From Swiss-Prot:
GO terms for biological process: regulation of translation; translation. Transmembrane segments: none annotated. The keyword rRNA-binding applies. Binds directly to 23S rRNA. The L1 stalk is quite mobile in the ribosome, and is involved in E site tRNA release. GO terms for cellular component: cytosolic large ribosomal subunit. CDD domains: Ribosomal_L1. This is Large ribosomal subunit protein uL1.
Length: 234
């Protein structure tokens, strides 16, 4: 049997895996256990009551967290004309059409989000094999294919998170950094849960949000008692 590290022993002794923690208690515990030499992200896993094998029950979308994610996001935008100027004014680091596509084909991938206006999809479509595996392909379902590219850039910069359930019906995303104020993490979590509720497939039956767990980059998962969250989110 593998020997537990000191960090793993502390987590084992501090975290009750059978308990659902009040949100404030959960965040305090995460902060206590976050001992890495960098500022860890606070990640969330939401188990949904869906049948992920059925395409009409899959959940996908995006929402802007009220307090952002704490990450600096670099944005590439495929567009032209007035939209190109608007994207630059909104803070996009890379803006173009065929010229931007050529950069990407050469392996120049210095961005975290790709946005495209509908008329640019003829160019972006050629990059599916490059952008797709990295989760960067623009998609109207998450607001990254839009005629209003400036708004999409603003959302990305403001802390928009994208979510999509995995094959087990679980959503994985981040809600901030461990050095965020506890109330900001709580409000970010509540905003995400509200967005997930709005995205509930009509075919999903029974309990929809079955379990919510928080963890830090290097830490263990802590189950959250949903009754302590804002009524709109639970």
């Amino acid at each position: 049997m593998a020997k537990l590290t000191k960090r793993m022993r502390v987590i084992r002794d501090k975290v009750d895996v059978t308990k659902q923690y009040d949100i404030n208690e959960a965040v305090a515990l995460l902060k206590e256990l976050a001992t890495a030499k960098f500022v860890e992200s606070v990640d969330v896993a939401v188990n949904l009551g869906i049948d992920a094998r059925k395409s009409d029950q899959n959940v996908r979308g995006a929402t802007v967290l009220p307090h952002g994610t704490g990450r600096s996001v670099r944005v590439a935008v495929f567009t032209q004309g007035a939209n190109a100027e608007a994207a630059k004014a909104a803070g996009a680091e890379f803006v173009g059409m065929e010229d931007l596509a050529e950069q990407i084909k050469k392996g120049e991938m210095g961005f975290d989000v790709v946005i495209a206006s509908p008329d640019a999809m003829r160019v972006v479509g050629q990059l599916g094999q490059v952008l797709g595996p990295r989760g960067l392909m623009p998609n109207p379902k998450v607001g990254t294919v839009t005629p209003n590219v400036a708004e999409a850039v603003n959302n990305a910069k403001a802390g928009q998170v994208r979510y999509r359930n995995d094959k087990n019906g679980i959503i994985h995303t981040t809600i901030g950094k461990v050095d965020f104020d506890s109330n900001k993490l709580k409000e970010n979590l509540e905003a995400l849960l509200v967005a997930l509720k709005k995205a509930k497939p009509s075919q999903a039956k029974g309990v929809y949000i079955k379990k919510v767990s928080l963890s830090t980059t290097m830490g263990a998962g802590v189950a959250v008692d949903q009754s302590g969250l804002n009524a709109a989110a639970n």
